[in-house]
Amino acid sequence: MGNSPSYNPPAGISPSDWLNLLQSAQRLNPRPSPSDFTDLKNYIHWFHKTQKKPWTFTSGGPASCPPGKFGRVPLVLATLNEVLSNDEGAPGASAPEEQPPPYDPPAVLPIISEGNRNRHRAWALRELQDIKKEIENKAPGSQVWIQTLRLAILQADPTPADLEQLCQYIASPVDQTAHMTSLTAAIAAEAANTLQGFNPKMGTLTQQSAQPNAGDLRSQYQNLWLQAWKNLPTRPSVQPWSTIVQGPAESYVEFVNRLQISLADNLPDGVPKEPIIDSLSYANANKECQQILQGRGLVAAPVGQKLQACAHWAPKTKQPAILVHTPGPKMPGPRQPAPKRPPPGPCYRCLKEGHWARDCPTKTTGPPPGPCPICKDPSHWKRDCPTLKSKKLIEGGPSAPQIITPITDSLSEAELECLLSIPLARSRPSVAVYLSGPWLQPSQNQALMLVDTGAENTVLPQNWLVRDYPRTPAAVLGAGGISRNRYNWLQGPLTLALKPEGPFITIPKILVDTFDKWQILGRDVLSRLQASISIPEEVHPPVVGVLDAPPSHIGLEHLPPPPEVPQFPLN
């Protein structure tokens, strides 16, 4: 900041007294140099070391500085003594004596005359950073805040545009609005009292003080600008909206309510709040609510849709347990299970005593009452169906393979069970899929898709999407070679579920068929769902042999030809 040293005071002086000395040094003629500020700091160190006490205005007058040792420091002390003595006034001889306070309250007293003013120059970015660093921990409108800004103004003689830039750099938007309101009221009040050199016919005070030859008029505007910081309206202490974060056990509705209250208290009237609420309602939500919003494609949606998606979310609570070790007698052993109640009489199956009928060794398992509801095989119960093998492997067992961590969106056991019970037709294995996303046509929220384990990626027809969906060309390797003009990549997330209640899977990118022919559920979705396809064996396999028919019709019975289902090639 020019020739000014750091505003942080050296050891042996209070911040208010140090700011007074710096402001008094600004009135030296010629203007102070870096050596003058160095001499001033060396004088404070010398005074604190020799006098064994901090420097104050009453104890550190001009006589306390030895002449010729610290340069122009005696002139600085004399100027400060003259200004403060004229401002306070000497008490009369008949003034009643008062008991001094137990401590000297800190006070930053303004310098009435700034001396010879510097020529105007715009602040550099480095100087703005220095000013902000000095007052970042000070309250706006406090004495140290005002005195620091006054010193910065003395060195640069800023115009109203420079002061507005400084205000935007050091103050929050709320404080900027409050300061502008206070400054406008102060200018209107002073204009009514006829400012010195102000001509209403020449424009506003802001316009006239910006002229190169403004002189005292610019100084009056600067004083009003500083005075506006003192008159900032007091407001209750509210939590900034950027620090409001949803707690792990806090409902999403309460979190959004706190966010809206903070924005209403912090932002002035007329400032749009909806973009901030829409952004922070996802960014500051807890991890579980963020996963819900990601799965449903509502990351950038309005807050109303997010409230509907997370309204029924509740944290998973665990029963707390406290382990306390207390010295005392030996604790009893583990609790033994209660003995089973003996049967009241003999078993009605074998007519022997000692066991219940459900535990009778002569009990045999009869045939199932009907065919298996999964594979339609009448020879076994549902619990023994071989199609449940995949479920046992997922749960983990003696014959389970190595556990493969899914790509993302791990599913619960109940969700996996609802996926494994979807029947597939043999001729054309298809499943109903529920889709949602910003690029889908409104009518394509539910569709029938072909299950193809040979397709590496899921494919959608182009007529399911809006006209201007984000796309990039894709080269697909098929049976006939590489296709470069038929498929595109949809560059946008899409949410997919096999049942309306979920679970929901988010796919980052999908192949789009521009010929509108394929709707394929590929391995990318099947692996995310941890799905497996089980084909049961035939109950009565076909027999190859002679038929019981007339000789003219004797022949061999063959299986019907396999269905010709075009398979999407590996990519």
Curated annotation (Swiss-Prot):
Record bears the keyword Glycoprotein: no
Chain positions of site Cleavage: L109, P110, L323, V324, L419, L420, V544, G545
Major enzyme class: hydrolase
Renumbered zinc finger spans (CCHC-type): 345-362, 370-387
This protein's GO CC annotations: viral nucleocapsid
Residues in Peptidase A2 domain copies: 447-525
GO biological process terms held by the UniProt record: proteolysis; viral budding via host ESCRT complex; viral translational frameshifting
Posttranslational modification: Gag polyprotein: Myristoylated. Myristoylation of the matrix (MA) domain mediates the transport and binding of Gag polyproteins to the host plasma membrane and is required for the assembly of viral particles.
Pfam families with a match to the protein in the record: Gag_p19 (PF02228), Gag_p24 (PF00607), Gag_p24_C (PF19317), RVP (PF00077), zf-CCHC (PF00098)
Keywords: Aspartyl protease, Capsid protein, Host-virus interaction, Hydrolase, Lipoprotein, Metal-binding, Myristate, Phosphoprotein, Protease, Repeat, Viral budding, Viral budding via the host ESCRT complexes, Viral matrix protein, Viral nucleoprotein, Viral release from host cell, Virion, Zinc, Zinc-finger
Assigned EC number: 3.4.23.-
Domain notes: Gag polyprotein: Late-budding domains (L domains) are short sequence motifs essential for viral particle release. They can occur individually or in close proximity within structural proteins. They interacts with sorting cellular proteins of the multivesicular body (MVB) pathway. Most of these proteins are class E vacuolar protein sorting factors belonging to ESCRT-I, ESCRT-II or ESCRT-III complexes. Matrix protein p15 contains one L domain: a PPXY motif which binds to the WW domains of the ubiquitin ligase NEDD4.
Name recorded for this polypeptide: Gag-Pro polyprotein
Species this chain originates from: Bovine leukemia virus (isolate Australian)
